[in-house]
Amino acid sequence: MSAEASPANLSAKAAGRLPVALDAMGGDHGLTPNVDGAVQAARSGVSVLLVGDRVKLHAELGKHEGSSRLPIEVVDAPDVIGMEEHASDVRSRTGASINVCTRLVKEGRAAAAVSMGHSGATMASALLTLGRIKGVDRPAILAHLPAQGGFTTLLDAGANADVKPAYLAQWARLATVYLKVLEDRDNPTVGLLSIGEEDHKGSQQVVEAHTLLRALDGQGITFYGNVEGRDIFRSTTDIVVTDGFTGNVVLKLAEGEARVLLGWVKEALNSNVKSKLGGLLVRDSLRGLAERMDPSTLRREHLDRGAGAGLYRPRQRRRPRRQKRRAACRPRPRSAAGRAPGSGVRGAAGLRTAEPPGSL
């Protein structure tokens, strides 16, 4: 039942899975889409701790018929770190909604924390509250980019502009575990982003990382070798590792190109009467294509901090769209049981969780 609660008196569920803590105040578009998502999740059987301003959340929940009977609890946290504020504010603003979310995970009252808000603040809160997994020196942002047959997992997508070769090897192991556990990939392959497929191509950092990854091949990861930018979208490997500067450029480039291509398609279909008539015939198919290519649906962020995979930051849509059933993607030849959850996703792995990832 929808109810009011506070971090001090919340308790773990006596039976079943722990709830998911949702930072209802974070994001570019306010609490409305967050509450909408929480209600949809609750109706599908997921228990939710809705963290944010109690008065505003109850008012928003009241717009949803039957919300009082859903497994949603409101956790009061009126403070929110805005998108324009500094990530370091999490240190002093302990009552901020993202800090409350990560504390709920640490205290074992939530299985995971979800936020649409400030990426830096989310990362900082996770690091300060949950800590790192042993053996992981730096967090990374993980992104799923649309590719042939499904998606390619890219990291780092922006957390670390300057990295050491050892970080790339650590992220390869994190991403491998992530895909095995959460995406049912039996044997995900890892590629190292470079300017050529040859082992000696790339910067000194890339060459050294290649040596480390090659040594790890067969010991927790399956290393394919160097890959180029085009391979990300060809599904040459399941995972591509790179530094955060390059990864973020790749991510933003893909988003920009997707918008350009969609714009070209729209222009072509509106160029003359025949094109408009043809567009009517393929309208539904084109909507599905636009859904797959829409940059606002491509990003899901897991903060790979090295502490446990406890934070998930989906990207909010810029505008509402009708839900469309996704067509099943062709299985990859390397992955016997790969799921293809639509388009890209950005996220982070390595945060501690109250329950094993597979229990979510």
Swiss-Prot record:
Disordered as annotated region, ranges: 296-360
Basic residues: compositionally biased ranges: 314-333
Keywords for the protein's UniProt record, in alphabetical order: Cytoplasm, Lipid biosynthesis, Lipid metabolism, Phospholipid biosynthesis, Phospholipid metabolism, Transferase
Comp. bias (Low complexity): 334-350
Catalyzed chemical reaction(s): a fatty acyl-[ACP] + phosphate = an acyl phosphate + holo-[ACP]
Compositional bias (Basic and acidic residues): 296-305
Compartment(s) of residence: Cytoplasm
E.C. number: 2.3.1.274
Signal peptide span: none
GO molecular function terms noted in the UniProt entry: phosphate:acyl-[acyl carrier protein] acyltransferase activity
Protein's pathway: Lipid metabolism; phospholipid metabolism
Biological processes per GO annotation: fatty acid biosynthetic process; phospholipid biosynthetic process
SUPFAM superfamilies xref list: Isocitrate/Isopropylmalate dehydrogenase-like
Enzyme class: transferase
Main location group: cytoplasm
InterPro entries noted in UniProt: FA_synthesis (IPR003664), Phospholipid_synth_PlsX-like (IPR012281)
GO cellular component: cytoplasm
The family this protein is said to belong to: Belongs to the PlsX family.
Quaternary structure note: Homodimer. Probably interacts with PlsY.
Function: Catalyzes the reversible formation of acyl-phosphate (acyl-PO(4)) from acyl-[acyl-carrier-protein] (acyl-ACP). This enzyme utilizes acyl-ACP as fatty acyl donor, but not acyl-CoA.
Name under which the protein is recorded: Phosphate acyltransferase
Species the sequence originates in: Deinococcus radiodurans (strain ATCC 13939 / DSM 20539 / JCM 16871 / CCUG 27074 / LMG 4051 / NBRC 15346 / NCIMB 9279 / VKM B-1422 / R1)
